[in-house]
């Protein structure tokens, strides 16, 4: 029988096989194994890579520019790849200037190969300098010319994204922080300098591609949507969960984003392009929806879930709202447990609806339809697939952060002092919860 072959860095390699004979290792001879036939995936055009991001936060590249080198695991067999970058200016947080972008790609250890944009070496992401006049039309979606393969499931693609602005500041290009476990890091310099860089700064906010596209036979490709709590931490809990489960995903985190924004005119701006290449959504929103009250939050969620279903989303996964009340050392308090306690009670009850409208928590009306729920103790309570979240579910990711179930009160060790934001330790705890939720649901 011929020896087995393993796929490494784009090549099939026949490993040496030895046997222990008389206390010595002896190589076993044999004929080389033929490389298995390459069969590209047959399926819809999807994002097939991990570690993607929509770009809408400020980058400060300096006068010469700055590049970020990121790593992305591929989850499809592909003859070629099409990379894309989605620019969504957020002028309220400094992302105001038009930003020049160049990019390169390689296999680990290889040479950087330049990517082109309709044959050109660079392209531009549109900025905008006024939050008051920003409209959903102020967006940029750029796609590189195809990058040739072939590529196998499990291969790693390294991408270097270089950005610059005329002033060296206020550019558009950051989504998520550089992660040493997944990325190479950042380096400043001209295009000629960054492609020969030997060392990178593996910290701070980084620029990354938004999609790696190819036909895919994967069960799901995910769009992740969040607010500042998806931007601020070194590793958001969504990144932890989806990276750990080896799922293709695109993270879109925007300071101040609410479910109400998606229910209004900003659906296409924030999610529309991703949903051309993703069939599933995970939402960590709700922090910025509290001002709408319980009924308003329910209406926003139901509107967004209906939009998702109309857009062809197979599953919407909704996380419960993070705590909103804190008891300080010495007895002081901040925030308010409501409407967090009430909206989470409704979500934990499967977000019951009757004829498309929110039903009371705990209703026993036989016409009520509930979503699948994953409880605080990892019990899966099956719901009705006709519920607006479709094949998705509601995941209780809040219990691990609050002092007791339904208290909406931050555990002291996770309180970031403003009741809205939370950082690395809390995200790590939630990330473990999300990993288990995804596993329980077959992902």
What are the residue ranges of the model-derived segments?
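Viral virion structural and adsorption modules
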Residues: 1-33, 268-273, 278, 302-316, ...
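N-terminal secretory targeting modules
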Residues: 1-2, 6-225, 231
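Conserved SGNH/GDSL esterase-like catalytic core that processes O-acyl groups on lipids
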Residues: 86, 118, 210-212, 218-306, ...
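Conserved acidic residues
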Residues: 155, 279-281, 314, 373, ...
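Active-site-proximal beta-strand/loop segments in catalytic clefts of secreted hydrolases
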Residues: 162, 225-229, 251-257, 283-289, ...
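Structural alpha-beta junctions
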Residues: 243-250, 306-315, 353-358
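Catalytic His-Asp segment of secreted/periplasmic serine-dependent ester chemistry enzymes
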Residues: 324-443
């Amino acid at each position: 029988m011929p020896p087995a072959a393993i796929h490494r860095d784009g090549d099939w390699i026949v490993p040496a096989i030895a046997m222990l004979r008389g206390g010595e290792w002896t190589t076993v001879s044999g004929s080389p194994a033929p490389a298995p036939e390459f069969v590209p995936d047959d399926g819809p055009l999807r994002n097939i890579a991990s570690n993607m991001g929509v770009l809408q936060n400020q980058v400060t590249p300096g006068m010469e520019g700055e590049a970020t080198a990121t790593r992305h695991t591929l989850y499809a067999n592909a003859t070629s790849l099409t990379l894309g970058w989605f620019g969504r200016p957020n002028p309220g947080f400094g992302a105001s200037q038009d930003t020049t972008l160049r990019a390169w790609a390689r296999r680990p250890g290889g040479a950087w190969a330049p990517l082109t944009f309709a044959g050109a070496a660079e392209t531009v992401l549109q900025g905008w300098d006024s939050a008051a006049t920003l409209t959903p039309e102020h967006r940029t979606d750029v796609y590189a010319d195809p990058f040739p393969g072939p590529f196998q499931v499990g291969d790693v693609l390294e991408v270097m994204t270089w950005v610059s602005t005329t002033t060296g500041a206020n550019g558009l290009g950051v989504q998520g922080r550089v992660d040493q476990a997944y990325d190479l890091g950042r380096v400043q310099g001209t295009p000629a300098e960054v492609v020969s860089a030997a060392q990178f700064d593996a910290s701070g906010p980084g620029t990354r591609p938004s999609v790696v596209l190819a036909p895919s036979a994967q069960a799901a490709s995910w769009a992740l949507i969040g607010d500042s709590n998806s931007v601020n931490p070194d590793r958001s809990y969504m990144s932890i969960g989806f990276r750990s489960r080896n799922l293709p995903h695109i993270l879109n985190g925007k300071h101040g984003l609410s479910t109400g924004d998606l229910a209004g005119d900003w659906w296409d701006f924030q999610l529309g392009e991703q949903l051309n290449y993703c069939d599933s959504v995970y939402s960590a929103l709700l922090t910025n929806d509290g001002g709408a009250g319980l009924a308003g939050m329910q209406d926003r969620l139901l509107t967004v879930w209906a939009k998702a279903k109309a857009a062809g989303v197979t599953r919407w996964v909704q996380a419960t709202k993070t705590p909103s009340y804190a008891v300080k050392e010495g007895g002081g308090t901040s925030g308010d447990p409501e409407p967090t306690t009430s909206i989470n009670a409704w979500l934990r009850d499967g977000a019951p609806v009757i004829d498309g409208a929110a039903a009371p928590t705990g209703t026993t009306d036989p016409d009520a339809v509930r979503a699948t729920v994953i409880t605080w103790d990892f019990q899966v309570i099956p719901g009705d697939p006709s519920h607006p979240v479709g094949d998705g579910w509601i995941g209780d990711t809040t219990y691990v952060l609050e002092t007791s179930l339904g208290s909406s009160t931050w555990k002291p060790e996770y309180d970031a002092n403003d009741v809205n934001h939370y950082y690395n330790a809390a995200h790590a705890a939630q990330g473990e919860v999300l990993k288990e939720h995804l596993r329980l649901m077959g992902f």
